[in-house]
From Swiss-Prot:
This is 3-hydroxybenzoate 6-hydroxylase. Belongs to the 3-hydroxybenzoate 6-hydroxylase family. It is an enzyme of class 1 (oxidoreductase). It comes from Corynebacterium glutamicum (strain ATCC 13032 / DSM 20300 / JCM 1318 / BCRC 11384 / CCUG 27702 / LMG 3730 / NBRC 12168 / NCIMB 10025 / NRRL B-2784 / 534). Catalyzes the NADH-dependent conversion of 3-hydroxybenzoate to gentisate (2,5-dihydroxybenzoate). Is involved in the utilization of 3-hydroxybenzoate as a sole source of carbon and energy for C.glutamicum growth. Displays a high preference for NADH over NADPH as cosubstrate. Is not active with 4-hydroxybenzoate, salicylate, protocatechuate or benzoate as substrates. Activity is reduced by the addition of 0.1 mM of various metal ions, including Ca(2+) (16%), Mn(2+) (20%), K(+) (30%), Zn(2+) (64%) and Cu(2+) (83%). However, the addition of 0.1 mM Mg(2+) enhances activity by 16%.
Length: 442
């Protein structure tokens, strides 16, 4: 399938820092509108940390608008549904079916894909669209000046070498949760959640218990959860174990948090109260590597002149809504769309465009960050709160769950509009009521 090129941004020079999913998506979306895009990634190669990620219909529609669906579907997997199960007894408490009704309601499908496969597709197509991508280069600073923005770069491999200052029209900082550019706006640090993740992939066909898996399954329980779904057309089984580290909590209380909180010894202890099926799965994970889960506080301002923070640099979320990658892709499409619209109208002013993008994106992304934290609380409650949570999920299963997902999945970054229940811009009232009721039971 050929990519959908246009030329509204021809002659516009843009620098992107960060070669993850958001940065590569930004390079692609802007190059497809004719912009002269250069991306700098500090690492020696384009590489994503982790294994699988989930793309809801809000991401599907963007990939479709970029002409990538054929490649994405071949590389990924289309699950039949998402099942929430109680981690203590494996009871299914909610099934979200990705059937024809779902597809018609949201105008898209639900897909899971290996992070490296998605990044490779974005990088390959960004270069095919004309973007220039470079590894081993760090963007160190920027300054808005008359007629543009100066961007300082240097070698990230041989520090202090190959220093240059480039003058371009706009600078987009997709430089991740440990963003260099964020420091120009606020002196803060990532917020540790006290939770840690272990991941692993294996051959699905060789797993007798899981070889017929066609779903995304999330086991949720007191202070833990465990995720399973197929990848690469059903070739791989992706599994993720996430639990709250007692060593982190004890260290925080004592004022001395150990660097290795969440180690494998804690992993085994954390699931003692879970169904034996889950406990037996822990040995299949990559036990030599674990990820301490952090997010960022929502920012009040993402922009300085012609520089805009985007992706995890601006709004790193926790993983519970499975929307971090899609949020970054939404950012990318918003910049390209708003700039192309302004250019088509003959009034392209990059400071105004980036301010408009921020005004559109910041409330939504802050909401996803905030609701993501609550969603994690809801997954991990214990005691009476767990029983209430389970009944709430059962009721959603019986009464229809679209109303709880429309605010997230109904957003279409390629059309500046929600396609389903646009009035649900805030966290639905029912979710707020659940939160208060559940947390009172702790």
């Amino acid at each position: 399938m050929s990519l959908p090129h246009s030329d509204e941004l021809r002659g516009q020079k843009i620098i992107i820092s960060g070669g993850g999913i958001g940065g590569a998506a930004g390079a692609l979306a802007l190059a497809l509108r004719g912009a002269d895009v250069t991306l700098y990634e500090r690492a020696a190669e384009f590489k994503e940390v982790g294994a699988g990620l989930q793309i809801g219909p809000h991401g599907w529609r963007m990939l479709e608008s970029w002409g990538l669906l054929d490649q994405i579907v071949v590389a990924g997997y289309l699950p039949e549904d998402m099942q929430f199960r109680d981690a203590v007894n494996r009871e299914t408490i909610l099934t979200m079916r990705f059937d024809e009704e779902f597809q018609q309601h949201y105008g898209g499908r639900y897909l899971v894909i290996h992070r490296s496969d998605l990044l490779n597709i974005l990088v390959t197509n960004a270069e095919a669209a004309g973007a220039k991508l470079h590894n081993g280069v760090l963007v160190t600073d920027s300054r808005t000046v008359d007629g543009g923005i100066e961007v300082d770069i240097e070698s990230s491999i041989n520090k202090g070498e190959d220093n240059k200052t480039l003058l371009v029209d706009a600078f987009l900082a997709f430089d991740g949760i440990h963003s260099v550019m964020r420091k120009k706006l606020v002196d803060d640090a990532p917020v540790a959640s006290s939770y840690v993740a272990y991941r692993g992939t294996s051959k699905l066909a060789e797993d007798a218990e899981m070889k017929d898996l066609k779903s995304v399954i999330g086991y949720i329980g007191p202070h833990v959860h465990f995720i399973q779904y197929p990848l690469r057309g059903g070739e791989l089984l992706n599994q993720v174990a996430v639990f709250e580290s007692q060593r982190y909590l004890d260290g925080r209380t004592a004022g001395d948090i150990p660097e290795d909180w969440g180690n494998p010894e804690e992993l085994d202890r954390a699931y003692n109260h879970c169904d034996p099926f889950i406990q037996d799965r822990l040995d299949t994970l990559w036990r030599n590597n674990w990820w301490q889960m952090s997010d960022r506080e929502p920012l009040e301002n993402w922009r300085i002149g012609r520089m805009l923070l985007l992706g995890d640099a601006a709004h790193a979320p926790l993983q519970y809504l499975a929307s971090g990658a899609v949020m970054a892709m939404e950012d990318a499409e918003a910049v390209a769309l708003f700039a192309a619209d302004a250019a088509r109208a003959g009034n392209l002013d990059w400071e105004e465009v980036l301010a408009e993008v921020e005004a559109e994106r910041r409330p939504r992304c802050s909401r996803i960050q905030t609701v993501g934290r609550f969603w994690g609380e809801l997954w991990h409650v214990e005691g009476t709160a767990r029983l209430i949570r389970n009944e709430v999920f059962r009721q959603a299963d019986r009464n229809g769950w679209f109303i709880y997902a429309d605010w997230l999945w109904g957003y279409d970054a390629s059309k500046r509009a929600h396609i389903a229940n646009p009035e649900l811009g805030e966290m639905p009232q029912a979710l707020k009521e659940w939160r208060y009721a559940l947390l009172e039971q702790k």
